[in-house]
Amino acid sequence: MTSLISLALLPLSSLAWDAPTMGWSSWNAFGHRINEDIIRSQADALVSKGLKDAGYIYVNIDDGAWCGRDSEGHLVIHPTRFPNGLKPLIDHIHDSGLKAGTYSDAGHNTCASFWGGDRDGIGTGLYEHDEEDARFMFGELGFDFIKVDFCGGDGPQNSEHLDLDERERYTAISNAIKATGRTDVRYNVCRWAYPGTWVEDVATSWRMSQDIYLGWESVKDIIHQNLYLSAYATKGRFNDMDMLEIGRGMTDEEDKTHFGMWCMMSSPLLIGCDLREIDDKAVALLSNPELIALNQDPLALQAYVVKRYNGGYILVKDVDELRGTTRALALYNPTDRAMNMGIDFFDIDLGEEADVRDLFDRKDLGHFTGSFETIVPAHGTRIFRISADRRLERRVFEAETAFNPSYQELDNNQAVKSGIYEELDVCSGGAKASWLGSREDNYVTWRDIWSNDGGEYEMTINFITGADRNITVIVNGEMIGNITVNSGGWDVIGSTTLKINLKKGENEIILSNPSDWMPDIDCITLTREGDLELFRHRHRQALRDALAIDKSGLPEKMARRFDELILLESDPEDSKETYEKATENLNKIALEIQIALDAQQTFGKTLDCAVRNSGASEESEALASFDGVLDEAVSMVADAELPDVFSDATEKVQFAMKEYLSNEGAILKKGSVWDMTCFIENPDFDSDTHGWKGEPVWGSHVAEYWNRTFEVSQTVEGLRNGFYTLNVQALYRVKANDGGAAYRSGSEVIPAKIYANDSSMPISSLYSHKVSDSALLEAELSGTHVLNGYVNSMHGAEMAFNSGFYWNILPTTVKDGALRIAISSDTSQADCWCCFDNFTLYFQGAEDNAVDLNIDDSDKIDVYTPSGICVSRGMTKAEVKQLPSGIYIVNGEKIIIR
């Protein structure tokens, strides 16, 4: 334990650190295809567009500037890309008041030499040339920054299959830079994952994720990977979230989130677009002085997650003064729907009274008491400066904000016994520190615990473990005790409380177990004896949340029961124990209400389908029995007091519907159809892809395959024999989006097909529907979700499907009670893409019951699918007859086209 007890506390409160690097880098826009004119023009644009004045001063020449080595092993500057050498260009950059950056690799070869086909990069890496190259780059040429990749040191990414040790190589390069005598060189480690805590002693910044690409999914993923790394941005050393894609095609909200979250998380800000083509809107966003101030704040802190909120995240950090009365707050919504988000000032350690300023719009929003909330659009972020009347001592310290000396992302954490951070809904902040213990340095430590006056505190540790595990507690170097705990499950929170003494000022608390695995840690809570404010606040919050849920649509008895349960917990006795119990009960009640509402919605959809099928049936004994079951289900729900009734009633209706539709005594009306979708498992991919073979990718409530051959299938059993129509929304792109030239010329061949037993048909072409075909869709989709006028993402496909696009209608027959449905393609091209959703199945009868079109040749009619989606408006009778085979609704009547 000596290594833990001897740790010194960092006196952070009075220090100011270097800020994250700001500038421009060539890779995103140009790859290795760079030259002197490009770099010079970008440097000039930084100045002319005011970006230099905004703080962007580094001009970084990424991969592509070198061309092997000469006979003596010296680096050769690329003779055609930089015919005048690099020195005149660097001098021009310096003369413009800017700084110049360069690139290399920790191995022999650069990344572009392997992945980009740039053979000129072979042999230009630093390996075996560290000191010589450092003298050349930072002494002779005068570079001020270097990014060092690791393709040449990672066996699968270099032609030599050279495997090097990251720590050894990056440390050696750091030492070579220091040996030049330059102390102002900024050094970026690019290993595409957080390399380990050793890196803060080596580099200025380090990449913590894979390369960014132009797309919302990439931005969202990088933010997610950095949510729980706030403890590792320290002492002016930063987690690098990669270059900025702003101004290159994402939506305005996505660009704002991209820039705003990079600023909140104190990432380096390196513009990645072609500055000669950047628009004024992007320049204005990149130049926002109030967002830049967050990024360049002398405290050099990365915002940490305070709480998760319905799929969104709330982050906060100090600005201007450590533990001062002003904090920056980000409300981040990565979901595909707008949401109301807010925060109680108490939860961000601020007093009741506060002024709020919007940093995107750069305007004061006014004075608020107790809390603040606003609407945050899908993929959006809102960032505020909150200035309060007082600063409170922080009471809750989430484990995902704690530092772990063993943390790294290069090796399997279980193999090397290093801790990680994982999201778990039951945790107070929505995440936990896990896989802790079993080695000396695999522990969690909070190094910034502040006490205004010092003294005795109650420390409550929230933990998760399904087995007996030990925790050693160390406070300011003193071992307080060893505790054995068990919460009773790996998704159950347990807690234990002990008394500790804190000194006035900064303190450090460590939870460890060097000899064996310890429990996962949710958080620690610090309160003084008799301090009930935290527990009162949690209770008020839980009461407010429970009351805010709209119960008006629930059955009267059920809604009244919930109100009575809430009332019972609304006014507990003034003690820690009673507040905690009442809060726990209120949270359970709120969850029960939400489950009831979801179950009610599912029941409603199931009942609607059953009623439609009843209406499509001839009178019969089987129908009377079926209708009787539906009446019973409705009565069950109307008189329900407990939420379980909804699921019971849903199962009752589903079972009765399947029984009825399979009953030979049930008779379908001529010209009508039965909706048999209830026989398909997971037809709409609402939450995942269960029920389907083939493992398609799931997201945005749709399924997809990209860049590959595939088959997704399901066999539906228990069906009547007869005629059916399978409907599914699906699109296929044969190769990279070229605007649909082959589709328009009639030469496009789509290899992907929909199958229903012996029937098959090609999937609809991506190019069969333009985004502009729907004014609503055109208004809602932009940026990377659209390319050349067509949807270009899973979210885009979801929105197009919601607009009624890409229906594929396939008639088929069932002869043995079973129907195999599938989508497959046995060929693929680069960038081919298939996206699909919403399988529906309709039974047309044992015989062909098509209905003649009872309309005049001159009539203009609207055509719908059986589910009410408009296929087309203003069609003639001749045009309707040319529709693909299937079931449609015309003039309120179902018709079948063969």
Q: Where are each of the predicted segments found?
A:
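Aromatic-lined carbohydrate-binding/catalytic grooves of carbohydrate-active enzymes
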Residues: 38, 42, 46-159
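Aromatic-lined carbohydrate-recognition surfaces of secreted/lumenal glycan-active proteins
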Residues: 98-116, 177-196
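Glycan-recognition surfaces
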Residues: 129-132, 179-180, 184-274
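Carbohydrate-binding surface patches
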Residues: 262-265, 270-272, 308-350, 379, ...
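C-terminal beta-sandwich/jelly-roll accessory domains of carbohydrate-active enzymes
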Residues: 323-325, 331-408, 415, 866, ...
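Extracytoplasmic
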Residues: 339, 348-353, 381-537, 658-846
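Beta-rich interaction/scaffold domains
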Residues: 530-679
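C-terminal outer-membrane/trafficking sorting elements
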Residues: 850-898
